[in-house]
Amino acid sequence: MFKLISDTSCDWIKEYAEEHNVTLVPLYTTFDGQTYYKEQFEISYDEFYRKMTDENAFPKSSLPSIQDYVDAFMPSVEAGVPIICCCITTYFSGSYNSACTARDMIIEDYPDAKITVINSLQNSASMSLFVYEAMCMRDAGYSYEDTVKKLEAMRPFGRIIFTTESLDYLTKGGRLVKTATMITSKLNLRPIIIMKGCLLYTSPSPRDA
């Protein structure tokens, strides 16, 4: 048995994670650069999207602190339970680095602690499935070591395929270049967007009918 921990990039709601004994470490969100909210703990996904649509607010995210991870790890470390921590791709966030630093700090005082931090190479929907697979292996009785091996092998294969009415938020967030947004807008196109290996690609799509 092992403890499963994930940052909130997996898009699980807090209640679902608690029901399935998965600890969430929140990323932070700000709309004004001054007030930061812990995702799922101080602002729900519904509130997040309502601010974007009703207030036309553009969010920015920040990684969990090292202390956030220390606080999440310590109960299991003190109980002698191995930990698997799944983190958003390092291409989008420094969450993995915070978790690794927290692990290294803890191991100085608890050298026998078993803490594996995984750079999932995923985000959002594919990260959700990654954590779900880890949970299923835990519940099926897979060992800590076997689960780590299988998760490491899964990392390169996640994909997200989606489309959206507007590319504005992806452009503002630096995920797509402005030229692509301008062209698709003028031609009234909704491109198919693929996230693969931490990068976004666009595929040709029919015009919006």
Roles of regions detected by a PLM:
Residues 3-62:
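N-terminal glycine-rich anion-binding loop in soluble enzyme alpha/beta folds
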Residues 4-6, 85, 116-119, 147, ...:
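General beta-strand structural signal in soluble alpha/beta enzymes
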Residues 88, 95-160:
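Active-site histidine-anchored catalytic micro-motif
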Residues 138-197:
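Internal, active-site/partner-interface "lid" segment
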Residues 201-209:
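Single conserved hydrophobic/aromatic residue that forms the stacking wall/gate
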